[in-house]
UniProtKB/Swiss-Prot annotation:
<keyword id="KW-0472">Membrane</keyword>
<keyword id="KW-0813">Transport</keyword>
<protein>
    <recommendedName>
        <fullName>Cytochrome b6-f complex subunit 5</fullName>
    </recommendedName>
</protein>
<comment type="similarity">
    <text>Belongs to the PetG family.</text>
</comment>
<dbReference type="InterPro" id="IPR003683">
    <property type="entry name" value="Cyt_6/f_cplx_su5"/>
</dbReference>
<keyword id="KW-0793">Thylakoid</keyword>
<dbReference type="InterPro" id="IPR036099">
    <property type="entry name" value="Cyt_6/f_cplx_su5_sf"/>
</dbReference>
<keyword id="KW-0249">Electron transport</keyword>
<dbReference type="Pfam" id="PF02529">
    <property type="entry name" value="PetG"/>
</dbReference>
<dbReference type="GO" id="GO:0045158">
    <property type="term" value="F:electron transporter, transferring electrons within cytochrome b6/f complex of photosystem II activity"/>
</dbReference>
<keyword id="KW-0812">Transmembrane</keyword>
<comment type="function">
    <text>Component of the cytochrome b6-f complex, which mediates electron transfer between photosystem II (PSII) and photosystem I (PSI), cyclic electron flow around PSI, and state transitions. PetG is required for either the stability or assembly of the cytochrome b6-f complex.</text>
</comment>
<dbReference type="GO" id="GO:0017004">
    <property type="term" value="P:cytochrome complex assembly"/>
</dbReference>
<keyword id="KW-1133">Transmembrane helix</keyword>
<feature type="transmembrane region" description="Helical">
    <location>
        <begin position="5"/>
        <end position="25"/>
    </location>
</feature>
<keyword id="KW-0934">Plastid</keyword>
<dbReference type="GO" id="GO:0009512">
    <property type="term" value="C:cytochrome b6f complex"/>
</dbReference>
Length: 37
């Protein structure tokens, strides 16, 4: 039962982590583009 619970947590965290990295990279790109770098 604990394995299933941990598996569910991992499946829940992976999309959130990927989304966070994507948003961070996008904001860095927009910031650099705005500064003309």
């Amino acid at each position: 039962m604990i394995e299933v619970f941990l598996f569910g947590i991992v499946l829940g965290l992976i999309p959130i982590t990927l989304a966070g990295l994507f948003v961070t990279a996008y904001l860095q790109y927009k910031r650099g583009d705005r500064l003309g770098l």
